[in-house]
C-alpha cells in the first residue's frame, strides 16, 4: 500500500510504503514528474513500514512507483484521473500506458479528456493497447464520436495487425449501420480467423440472412476455428438443430468470458442441452466437462 504526504511549505513529498503480511526487503524505483521532467530515485524498502522523502519545485504531476516495472507485487496506489492521464502521455513504458488506460476508460463517460485519451490510444505502437482501447471505447456517451469513428474505420480497413483489425470491426458492428456491410463482407474473406469471426458477428447485426448464408458456406474445420462467433449466432437464432455444436462450446461462453450478456445467453443454451434428449449434444457437453 502506498500513500503520500505533501508538505507544500518545505516543498517535499513523503512516500509511505506499507507491506501487509510478511515484509520483504527489495529495491524500488520511483520517478517523480514535475513540469520540467522527471527525477528518478532508487531506494531500498525494508520492513513493514518504510518512508522516503523527496524535494520538489512544484507539486508533482505524477509519482510513479516501481517505475521500472520489475516487482512481482501488487501495488495499491491511489492516483487521480489527472495522474493517470499524465502517466499515459508521459511515462515511457508499455505497462505505464496500459495500467493508466485501464483506469482512464472508466471515466470516459463524464470526462472529455479521458475519452479523447482512449481515442489517442488507437495510435499506440503496441497492438495490445490498441485492442484494449477499441474493446473499451464508449461511442454512446455525450462527446462527439465522429473523429473516433473515422479512426476506427481506418484501423478496420488498414491496420497491419489482424487482432487490431478484428477489434475495430467489432466496434463498427455495434453501431448497427448498414453502410459497413461491404466492409464486413470483405472481412469474411480475410485469412485471419479473428477478422472473419468479428466480421461474421458484425454482419449478423445488420443482415442476419447474409450472415447465415456465409456461415452455412463455411467448412466444418473453419466453423470450429470460429466457434465463439458461430455458437453465439446459433444460440441467438434459437437454432437447436445445431445443439451438438453448441454443446462443444457452451462452457467457454459461460465461464471463460466476463461479459454478463454472453454468460446469460450461453446459460440459456446450457438449459436446452440439459433438458434435451439429444445424445450427441449431451455427450459433447460431458466431454467438455472432463
Where are these regions (language model features)?
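Non-catalytic accessory/interaction domains
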Residues: 1-139, 143-144, 160-161, 165, ...
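Generic serine detector
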Residues: 29, 40, 50-51, 57, ...
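Generic preference for flexible, low-structure residues
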Residues: 31-33, 46-48, 79-81, 87-91, ...
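Structural detector for internal amphipathic alpha-helices that build alpha-solenoid repeat scaffolds
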Residues: 69-73, 95-109, 120, 130-143, ...
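Amphipathic alpha-helical scaffolding segments comprising HEAT/armadillo-like alpha-solenoid repeats
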Residues: 77-87, 110-122, 142-157, 177-189, ...
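Short inter-helical turns and helix N-cap capping residues of alpha-solenoid HEAT/ARM repeat scaffolds
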Residues: 92-93, 125-126, 160-161, 191-192, ...
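Non-catalytic carbohydrate-binding regions of carbohydrate-active enzymes
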Residues: 254-265, 285
Amino acid at each position: 500500500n502506498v500513500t503520500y504526504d505533501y508538505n507544500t511549505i518545505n516543498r517535499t513529498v513523503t512516500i509511505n510504503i506499507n507491506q501487509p503480511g510478511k515484509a520483504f526487503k527489495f529495491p524500488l524505483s520511483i520517478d517523480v514528474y514535475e513540469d520540467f521532467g522527471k527525477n528518478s530515485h532508487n531506494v531500498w524498502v525494508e520492513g513493514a513500514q518504510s518512508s522516503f522523502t523527496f524535494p520538489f519545485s512544484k507539486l508533482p504531476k505524477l509519482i510513479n512507483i516501481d517505475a521500472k516495472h520489475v516487482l512481482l507485487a501488487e501495488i495499491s496506489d491511489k492516483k487521480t484521473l489527472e495522474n493517470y492521464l499524465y502517466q499515459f502521455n508521459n511515462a515511457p513504458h508499455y505497462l505505464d500506458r496500459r495500467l493508466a488506460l485501464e483506469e482512464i476508460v472508466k471515466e470516459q463517460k463524464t470526462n472529455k479528456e479521458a475519452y479523447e485519451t482512449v481515442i489517442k490510444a488507437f495510435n499506440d505502437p503496441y497492438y495490445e493497447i490498441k485492442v484494449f482501447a477499441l474493446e473499451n471505447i464508449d461511442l454512446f456517451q455525450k462527446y462527439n464520436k465522429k473523429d473516433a469513428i473515422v479512426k476506427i474505420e481506418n484501423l478496420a480497413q488498414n491496420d497491419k495487425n489482424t487482432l487490431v483489425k478484428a477489434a475495430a470491426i467489432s466496434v463498427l458492428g455495434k453501431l448497427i449501420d448498414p453502410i459497413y456491410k461491404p466492409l464486413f463482407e470483405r472481412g469474411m474473406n480475410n485469412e485471419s480467423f479473428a477478422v472473419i469471426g468479428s466480421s461474421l458477428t458484425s454482419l449478423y447485426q445488420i443482415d442476419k440472412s447474409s450472415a447465415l448464408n456465409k456461415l452455412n458456406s463455411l467448412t466444418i474445420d473453419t466453423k470450429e476455428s470460429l466457434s465463439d462467433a458461430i455458437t453465439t449466432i446459433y444460440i441467438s437464432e434459437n437454432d437447436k438443430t445445431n445443439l451438438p455444436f453448441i454443446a462443444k462450446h457452451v462452457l467457454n461462453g459461460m465461464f471463460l468470458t466476463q461479459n454478463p450478456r454472453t454468460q446469460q445467453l450461453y446459460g440459456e443454451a446450457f438449459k436446452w442441452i440439459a433438458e434435451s434428449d439429444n445424445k450427441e449434444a449431451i455427450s459433447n457437453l460431458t466431454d467438455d466437462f472432463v
